[in-house]
A protein has these predicted regions:
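Phosphate-group recognition and catalysis centered on beta-loop-alpha active-site segments
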Residues: 1-255
């Protein structure tokens, strides 16, 4: 059974051009920016700090009510903004009327691109959930990225995102995020392979606690870079070094 799945992996997922994806292996990525010490995750301050430290940036992105791609992880504002509002039910202007503890407001993707300005690479995780129209989000991401020359990639747990970029923006580097625990959508072996075949990604971003495993080993052998998250300790940093190509890290997991 496993040999059949491996053959199907090779059939559905082509090896990416090393010239397109090689840069992914060369960086440590700050998970949601370089947060801590008063800097909030996914905030302008966290992104500025990551750039200053020469770290790549991983960020989260979801859609506002008026279809702006907003940089924010949680579906609601309670944890970080002290509001019970849902992000998808509020316009960009309503998002930006709220403030983090440091006084800054959430930003959209265009504002993040201005902060980064090509100085470090950017990993953009597109948020999704059941019955969510990811196509609308993907279109706005492409609009925001038009003309941006800095290294960047789009990724998601939802294989529809990578598949959409393959079809509609094939030069955008695209990845599939995966985990195997109870919080993931790919707990079973067959579900992981089905997601891989649907996504047809250029790279994987795999949960560090699931390493090592056969899928990651096969992907690296086939030329797909494998990033791993969230690396939050020296021990996990060593695991990432052994079994993946680059870490998405925070706190004590950063170099």
């Amino acid at each position: 059974m496993r040999s059949l799945l491996s053959r199907l992996d090779r059939f559905f997922v082509a090896s990416p051009d090393p010239a397109r994806v090689g840069w992914l292996r060369e960086w440590t990525y700050a998970h949601r920016g370089l947060h801590g010490e008063g800097r909030v995750e996914n905030s302008p301050a966290a992104f500025r700090a990551a750039v200053e430290e020469g770290l790549g940036i991983e960020c989260d992105l979801q859609r506002s009510l008026d279809d702006w791609p907003m940089v924010f992880h949680d579906w609601d504002f309670a944890r970080l903004l002290g509001s019970t509002d849902q992000g998808e039910r509020r316009t960009r202007a309503q998002w930006q009327a709220l403030h983090y503890a440091d006084g800054e407001a959430p930003i959209d993707l265009a504002a993040l691109l201005e902060i980064v300005a090509g100085r470090v690479p950017l990993l953009i995780e597109v948020k999704s959930k059941p019955r969510y129209d990811v196509t609308r989000t993907c279109r706005r991401v492409v609009d925001a990225l038009e003309g941006y020359a800095g290294p960047h990639a789009v990724m998601s747990f939802d294989p529809r995102v990578s598949r959409w970029f393959k079809q509609h923006s094939p030069m955008t580097v695209r990845g599939l995020v995966m985990r195997e625990d109870s919080k993931g959508h790919t707990q079973s072996e067959i579900s992981r392979h089905l997601a891989l075949w649907a996504a047809q990604p250029d790279f994987l971003a795999y949960h560090v606690h699931a390493l090592p495993n056969r899928m990651v080993t096969a992907a690296r052998t086939a030329g797909l870079p494998v990033l791993t998250w969230t690396v939050s300790s020296p021990d996990l940093r060593e695991r990432a070094r052994q079994y993946a190509d680059a870490p998405i890290a925070e706190g004590a997991g950063l170099p």
